[in-house]
UniProtKB/Swiss-Prot annotation:
Keywords: Ribonucleoprotein, Ribosomal protein. Gene3D superfamilies: 2.30.30.790. GO terms for biological process: translation. One of its GO terms (cellular component) is cytosolic large ribosomal subunit. This protein is located at the 30S-50S ribosomal subunit interface and may play a role in the structure and function of the aminoacyl-tRNA binding site. Belongs to the bacterial ribosomal protein bL19 family. InterPro entries: Ribosomal_bL19, Ribosomal_bL19_CS, Ribosomal_bL19_sf, Translation_prot_SH3-like_sf. PROSITE patterns: RIBOSOMAL_L19. One of its GO terms (molecular function) is structural constituent of ribosome. This is Large ribosomal subunit protein bL19.
Length: 120
């Protein structure tokens, strides 16, 4: 057994199996575990998926939202223990793999058409 096969087998055990299908353009709500003192609480983060990187255990999504007039982007490792839940709220109809152009847009120009052919 080579070193790569050993690493893949260990990573396969760590993968989460209960993740929904997430596509670029979707509006998602990510529940992030935050530690305050000794307690953990779940903080929701809602926004549009503007980028997705596959790669086994290193799979990430970049979620963008506008908070108090300022664009905020966060990168989430999908298989991280800090991610409590991911819920798809709305499917978006886009024709790009990366939606970085949304960074330059303001207001109604950032809206994405809804897609109805994929289930939530």
């Amino acid at each position: 057994m080579s070193a790569q096969e050993i690493i893949r087998s260990i990573e396969a055990e760590q993968l989460k199996s209960n993740l929904p299908d997430i596509y670029v353009g979707d509006t998602v709500k990510v529940g992030v575990k935050i530690k305050e003192g000794e307690k953990y609480r779940v903080q929701p983060y809602e926004g549009v998926v503007i980028a997705k990187r596959n790669g086994g255990i290193n799979e990430t999504i970049t979620v963008r939202k506008v908070f108090q007039g300022v664009g905020v982007e966060r990168v989430f490792l999908l298989h991280s223990p800090r991610i409590d839940s991911i819920k798809v709220l709305r499917r978006g109809k886009v024709r790009r793999a990366k939606l970085y152009y949304l960074r330059d847009r303001v207001g109604k120009a950032t809206r994405i058409k809804q897609r109805f052919d994929r289930p939530l």
